[in-house]
């Protein structure tokens, strides 16, 4: 059977035969309980005897760690030309003296305060360094630890830019037209920095999209993209039952290559013991029951399955929180979620993943590392839950997206109405049918199997139907031609988030070698 044969003898539903990867770093029962290798045991110790210490069953529910702030180093480059008789002694630019530079530094500080107040992502601005000579970069406060340089290129030599690039720093190149004294490099950034006195761009890790003129909003979305990327690269994710890929066994390997993901495996035998330990803990069970009761009292919530399935889903949620605390991460995915986990947990993982996402974790079904990296990246950029889903076939500007694990706080705050039902394909357990809001603009990512091309599509939710498919269902309307979308669709699973983050995704992906094909 070929790698991409999905006919019925290959279990043709949204989760076909799993291709669990044994290449990812695994957590054996012993190492899991004692601490993950490579991390200090004292900070990672997780023994099942003191379950309440780890699982938070003293009433304090575990919460995910926050995103790491993007550290931004502002650097002002300028020159102080000296007047000379009967010759051209000064270049373009409104900053010509030390007094001009001091005033510009004060202006930059005001702008950084504006950016900080506007940012919906964690960012730390380091002290401004103003230089006339590349040698002044040596020992500049915070430069070595900075993730990104915000270069205010008022004037001065081009060597500063090259020096920053040689250090491997992402550089946002800011020049002024009318937002302050005009910049010299507003004139010559293209022919000198980008094209190196030629007709074609010569820079490899810096292009036209890295240059901003005047607009702080343009700086802000670039910083948002870089914050999301920094929180994605080398991040850790727990894979229950191993890492896999929808019809593509190399997906975990490719995810590691592109995003340096640290995939930690928890085997199903180990999970079975964790569930057994949690069920034996009366406080853990009581907390799960209390949470189930509170969840069902949320406005717009109706129960259409057995209450016990919801309580078991909450207990599984608490176990997964403890697993992620042990692994010191905020991301988890489940392999064989449409079979193996059901008799073990006596529910489905659908509602569990939904509640985890609502509380700020990144929780995905199917352990499909074709699409999981896109969810991690989009969530880290937007700071909101995302919805892994199955697409259908586009027609007349419309496509249906569906799955059984939809978050209820897709905007990060508002709890949307939901019917708590069974998982569709098993008619078992607890799964939310979230009524995602009509009129909402969504960013949709279509990752390719080869991890070299992702397609982007904006859509508007026009309906939340109730078809005989996965419970969470949305019809989205899009602007591009339906046939063109059908011809350009790669991979299988999509990732969807509220809002338009198409620019941020393209800006981030070019840094990891993935083509962003945005269809509008």
Features from the language model and the residues they span:
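Functionally engaged cysteine thiol sites
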Residues: 2-3, 7-21, 336-339, 345-352, ...
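N-terminal export signals
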Residues: 2-26, 31-55
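Conserved, well-structured core segments that form the ligand-binding/active-site neighborhood
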Residues: 35-36, 189-381
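Metallocofactor- and cofactor-centric catalytic cores in central/energy metabolism, strongly enriched
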Residues: 50-159, 164-188, 210-226, 253, ...
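Active-site proximal loops enriched in glycine and acidic residues that flank catalytic Cys/His/Asp
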Residues: 76, 153, 335-336, 389-392
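C-terminal catalytic subdomain
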Residues: 360-460
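Extended hydrophobic packing segments that form well-structured cores
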Residues: 430-520
């Amino acid at each position: 059977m070929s790698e991409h044969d999905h006919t019925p003898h290959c279990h043709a539903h949204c989760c076909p035969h799993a291709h669990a990867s044994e290449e990812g770093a695994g957590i054996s029962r012993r190492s899991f309980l004692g601490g993950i290798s490579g991390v200090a045991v004292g900070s990672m110790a997780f023994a099942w005897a003191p379950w309440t210490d780890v699982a938070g069953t003293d009433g304090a529910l575990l919460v995910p760690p926050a995103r790491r702030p993007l550290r931004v180093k502002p650097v002002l480059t300028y020159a102080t030309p000296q007047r000379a008789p009967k010759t051209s002694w000064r270049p373009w630019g409104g900053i010509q003296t030390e007094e001009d530079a001091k005033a510009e530094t004060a202006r930059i500080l005001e702008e950084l305060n504006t950016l900080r107040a506007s940012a919906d992502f964690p960012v730390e601005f380091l002290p401004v360094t103003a230089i006339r000579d590349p040698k002044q970069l040596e020992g500049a406060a915070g430069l070595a630890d900075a993730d990104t340089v915000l270069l205010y290129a008022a004037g001065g030599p081009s060597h500063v830019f090259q020096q920053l690039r040689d250090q491997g720093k992402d550089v946002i190149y800011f020049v002024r037209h009318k937002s302050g004294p005009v910049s010299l490099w507003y004139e010559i950034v293209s022919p000198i920095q980008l094209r190196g006195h030629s007709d074609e761009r010569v820079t490899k890790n810096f292009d036209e999209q890295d240059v901003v003129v005047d607009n702080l909003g343009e700086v802000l979305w670039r910083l948002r993209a870089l914050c999301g990327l920094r929180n994605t690269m080398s991040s850790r994710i727990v894979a229950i039952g191993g890492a896999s890929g929808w019809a593509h066994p190399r997906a975990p390997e490719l995810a590691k290559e592109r995003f340096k993901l640290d995939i930690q495996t928890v085997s199903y035998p180990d999970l079975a013991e964790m569930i057994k330990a949690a069920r034996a803990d009366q406080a853990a069970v009581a907390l799960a029951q209390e949470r189930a009761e509170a969840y069902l009292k949320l406005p717009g919530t109706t129960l259409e399955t057995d209450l016990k399935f919801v309580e078991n889903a909450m207990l599984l949620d608490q176990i997964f929180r403890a697993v992620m605390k042990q692994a010191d991460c905020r991301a988890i995915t489940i392999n064989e979620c449409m079979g193996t986990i059901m008799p073990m947990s006596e529910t489905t993982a659908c509602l569990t993943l939904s509640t985890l996402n609502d509380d700020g974790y990144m929780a995905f079904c199917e352990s499909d590392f074709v699409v999981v990296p896109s969810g991690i990246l989009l969530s880290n950029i937007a700071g909101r839950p995302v919805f892994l889903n199955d697409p259908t076939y586009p027609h007349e500007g419309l496509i249906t997206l569906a799955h059984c694990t939809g978050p209820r706080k897709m905007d990060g705050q508002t709890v949307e109405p939901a019917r708590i039902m069974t998982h569709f394909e098993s008619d078992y357990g607890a799964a939310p049918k979230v009524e995602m809001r009509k009129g909402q603009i969504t960013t949709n990512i279509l990752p390719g199997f080869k991890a070299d091309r992702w397609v982007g599509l904006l859509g508007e939710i026009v309906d939340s139907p109730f078809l005989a498919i996965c419970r969470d269902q949305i019809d989205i309307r899009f602007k591009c031609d339906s046939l063109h979308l059908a011809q350009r669709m790669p991979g299988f699973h999509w990732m969807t988030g509220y809002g338009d983050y198409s620019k941020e995704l393209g800006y981030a992906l070019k840094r990891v070698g993935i083509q962003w094909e945005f269809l509008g």
